[in-house]
Amino acid sequence: MTDNKQTVLLAKRVWYFSENDEAAFFEWLDKLPCVEKYEGRSDELEIYVNAAAADAGSVYELLALFRRYEIDMRQLRVFDREEFASWFRNRRAYWFKDIFEAET
C-alpha cells in the first residue's frame, strides 16, 4: 500500500531464532531513517516507510533485512526508481530474482 510518499511494507510471519534475534530485527528497523513507524497486527508487521526519504543506503539495508528475515521481497519494487536503477536492476544482484522474477 502506498500514497505519495508513504509506503506500507508487510512483514508476515517473521521467524526469530531467539529473543536477541527479534531485538536485532527491531533495532535494525529503528536505525533506518526512512522507516517512520511500524505496527503489529496478528502475525503481520506493517512497516511504514517514507519512500521519498529513502536513499541508496536505506534501500540496501531494507534489501538485506528482508533477505535475512525471509520477508517477501517483491514489495521492494516500490524502490525501482530512476535514481536506483543502475544498481537495483542488476541481474546478478542477490535480490534481483526475489524482487523481479518471483511468482506473484
Regions found by a protein language model. Give the residues of each.
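A generic structural motif
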Residues: 43-52
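Short, hydrophobic beta-strand segments
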Residues: 4-11
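Short acidic amphipathic segments
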Residues: 29-39
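Short, surface-exposed ligand-recognition loops at beta-strand->loop->(often short) alpha-helix junctions
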Residues: 11-21
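Short, ordered beta-strand-loop transition motifs
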Residues: 1-3, 39-43
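Histidine-anchored nucleotide/phosphate-binding helix
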Residues: 25-27
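Conserved strand-to-helix beginnings and helix N-cap segments that scaffold or border functional pockets
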Residues: 19-23, 56-59
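Helix-rich interaction surfaces within compact, conserved domain-sized segments
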Residues: 51-104
